[in-house]
Regions:
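Basic nucleic-acid-binding interfaces
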Residues: 1-104
Length: 104
């Protein structure tokens, strides 16, 4: 039985960077990365300065390891796809440290 989690996380410096240009890329990246781990996105909302996700994570995966994977890989994939982001964020840090999580 999977557990449902509401997760919220933000870009570094809470920059309002998630706009039309990057929304579709992030959506595709999140869906691809989640499918690799067997995580189901029940609902997701990309806001200009943060991301809300309702996900179902298999019990064998901890929330912290999943979030490290999701934020780490999505940052690398965004920098590969949109090289201009490196100038805004430098050092390949797209997401801010930490996240909010609650069981549903």
């Amino acid at each position: 039985m999977d557990v449902f989690y509401h997760i919220v996380f933000t870009p570094k410096y809470r920059r309002k960077i998630i706009n039309n240009q990057y929304q579709s890329s992030l959506g595709e990246i999140f869906h691809r990365l989640c499918s690799y781990k067997g995580v189901e996105i029940i609902e997701g909302h990309l806001m200009p300065d943060h991301v809300h996700m309702l996900v179902s994570i298999p019990p064998r995966i901890s929330v912290s390891s999943f979030m490290g994977y999701l934020k780490g890989k999505s940052a690398l994939m965004m920098f590969d796809k949109h090289a201009n982001l490196k100038y805004k964020f430098g050092n390949r840090h797209f997401w801010a440290e930490g996240y909010y999580v609650s069981t549903v």
